[in-house]
From Swiss-Prot:
Disulfide cysteine pairs (residue numbers): none
Taxonomic path: Eukaryota, Fungi, Dikarya, Ascomycota, Saccharomycotina
GO terms under cellular component: cytoplasm; nucleus
Sequence positions that bind ATP: G12, L13, D14, R15, T16, G17, K18, T19
Entries under CDD domains matching the protein: TMPK (cd01672)
Organism, scientific name: Saccharomyces cerevisiae (strain ATCC 204508 / S288c)
Name of the encoding gene: CDC8
Enzyme Commission numbers on file: 2.7.4.9
Catalysed reactions listed for this entry: dTMP + ATP = dTDP + ADP
HAMAP family given in the database record: Thymidylate_kinase (MF_00165)
Keywords annotated in UniProt: ATP-binding, Kinase, Nucleotide biosynthesis, Nucleotide-binding, Transferase
Name of this protein: Thymidylate kinase
Quaternary structure, from the entry: Homodimer.
Function: Catalyzes the conversion of dTMP to dTDP.
């Protein structure tokens, strides 16, 4: 029986090289791979999110924007599952973990990790999650484009990193073996690419039954 495709997620702070590595991996896995970037800004919900991220005058409560981010993931999940069942691999640039970490890092009353994860319960879990970690968040601020969108400040990114680590540690302690933290501090694009491929290649060669999925 033909196995399904693999769902591979690359997570991390802003300007840590996620998108670059997603694009590299996507091209490497052609012709049988699709690339998804969250938020998916081409949808109606994604358009609202894009406006919020790029226009400081567009105000929403922390709870409302968090639920919009989650809704943006839910509106695409059936398409993701369909592609996987057809045997296609999918590389994702951000997903549930980003949504939870960025919202919980705001410190809004009542929005702890458990509350922030609740709207995503039932979404597909990746077969592999790679978190690109850096020891020097300050260096990210010097990269082109940093600060163009809401959340791109060094102070907030430090909070997000701490929240990410708490969230991932919690998932790992619950027995999730699909998460790997990759230290990209002072590493070049090709060096990170090689590290990622060492982790991804064995997952690609593993057979996963057509109807076997994990969920948040």
């Amino acid at each position: 029986m033909m196995g399904r495709g693999k769902l591979i997620l690359i997570e991390g702070l802003d300007r840590t090289g996620k998108t670059t590595q997603c694009n590299i991996l996507y091209k490497k896995l052609q012709p049988n791979c699709k690339l998804l970037k969250f938020p998916e800004r081409s949808t109606r919900i994604g358009g609202l999110i894009n406006e919020y991220l790029t226009d400081d005058s567009f105000q929403l409560s922390d709870q409302a924007i968090h639920l919009l981010f989650s809704a943006n993931r839910w509106e695409i999940v059936d398409k993701i599952k369909k592609d996987l069942l057809e045997g296609k691999n999918i590389v994702m640039d951000r997903y549930v973990y980003s949504g939870v970490a960025y919202s919980a890092a705001k410190g809004t009353n009542g929005m702890d990790l458990d509350w922030c994860l609740q709207p995503d319960v039932g979404l597909l879990k990746p077969d592999l999650t790679l978190f690109l970690s850096t020891q020097d968040v300050d260096n990210n601020a010097e990269k082109s484009g940093f600060g163009d969108e809401r959340y791109e400040t060094v102070k907030f990114q430090e909070k997000v990193k701490q929240t990410f680590m708490k969230l991932l540690d919690k998932e790992i302690r619950k027995g999730d073996e699909s998460i790997t933290i990759v230290d990209v501090t002072n590493k070049g694009i090709q060096e990170v690419e090689a590290l990622i491929w060492q982790i991804v290649e064995p997952v690609l060669s593993t057979h996963i039954d057509h109807d076997k999925f994990s969920f948040f």
